Structure formats: structure tokens, C-alpha cells
Amino acid sequence: MSANSLLGSLRELQVLVLNPPGEVSDALVLQLIRIGCSVRQCWPPPESFDVPVDVVFTSIFQNRHHDEIAALLAAGTPRTTLVALVEYESPAVLSQIIELECHGVITQPLDAHRVLPVLVSARRISEEMAKLKQKTEQLQERIAGQARINQAKALLMQRHGWDEREAHQYLSREAMKRREPILKIAQELLGNEPSA
């Protein structure tokens, strides 16, 4: 995502502030409204999102509300950006930040001038992570598909005494003749093979 498109999209963001009512929540909501985001604040954490949410700002409490926040985030989309609000740093709080896979952290007391830079960098990080996850899944599918094709080649080589090139040519010819991907031909061939 380019800098211009990222900055331009800030006004379209649906933001949820998961924090008890008070000065911190009020200041954060006000700053997010100044940025141009559509903001809702709620506490305690709901069981699910009632509307789509792009960004969640949530307080991290030492061993409290962690499970509820984790369950809520798991129910969201993989592209939801998460920013932690941290009152103090302790091993338990840092562990929760890592477990929740936060994209950004704002320490308290809240400085309104930190909200925009953290929002922009967290949003960019979450978008990049979502793209990388999608690419990883695609690569895993391709590798699994190639493994199936190689299994089909091995079967043809064993069955007909062919070398790998001949087995590949056979799969390619069948795929072109039937106008199907080679993977589909390989899967059909392997699916028709009696199990040992």
C-alpha cells in the first residue's frame, strides 16, 4: 500500500476503542475523530463485532480480559489492525502484546501526538502482514500441487517404465487435450489408483 493511499484511507477506517470509560478513552476517541476516523468506544469487550472493524485500540491489562479480547479478535478479519494501549510494561503485559500479535503500541499517559504515527505504521504493518500471509498460503498451495504432480509422474514412471520427461509430457498432453490444469489430471490419476 503506497503512502498516499494509506494516508487517504484513514478517513474511511472503522475504529473500535476497547477501553474502560475515562480520560484515556475520551482523549483517544477525540484524537481519532480529529484524524477523520469513524470511532466507537465500548467496554467490556463484546463477544463479537456487530459491524466490520478495521482498527482496534485495546488496553492490555495484566492477565485480565486477555481471553475475551483474544476471542473477539479471532472472530474478526485477518486484516484487522490491532494497537495496544499499555499503562506499564511488565513481562505479562509484553507477553500479551506478543500473543495478540499487536501491530502497534501506545504507552500511557496518552500523548495525542503519538496516535497518528502509530495508527499509520500499525495499519501499514498489518496490511503487509496480511499480504505476506496470503502469498504464503498461495505458495503452500503451489508446493502441494507440485508434490501431487510429482507423485503422478512417479506413478506413471513406475507403471509404464517411463522417465520423468515422458511422464511430464503425458500429463501435459492430457491437460491440453482436455483443457484442464495439469494438477487436475494428476489428481484424477492419483485418485484412480487403488490403495495399497
From Swiss-Prot:
It comes from the Bacteria. Coiled coil: none annotated. Residues 129-190 form the ANTAR domain. SUPFAM superfamilies: CheY-like (SSF52172). Keywords: Transcription, Transcription antitermination, Transcription regulation. PROSITE patterns: ANTAR (PS50921). Gene3D superfamilies: 3.40.50.2300, Winged helix-like DNA-binding domain superfamily/Winged helix DNA-binding domain. Pfam families: AmiR_N, ANTAR. This is Aliphatic amidase regulator. It comes from Pseudomonas aeruginosa (strain ATCC 15692 / DSM 22644 / CIP 104116 / JCM 14847 / LMG 12228 / 1C / PRS 101 / PAO1).
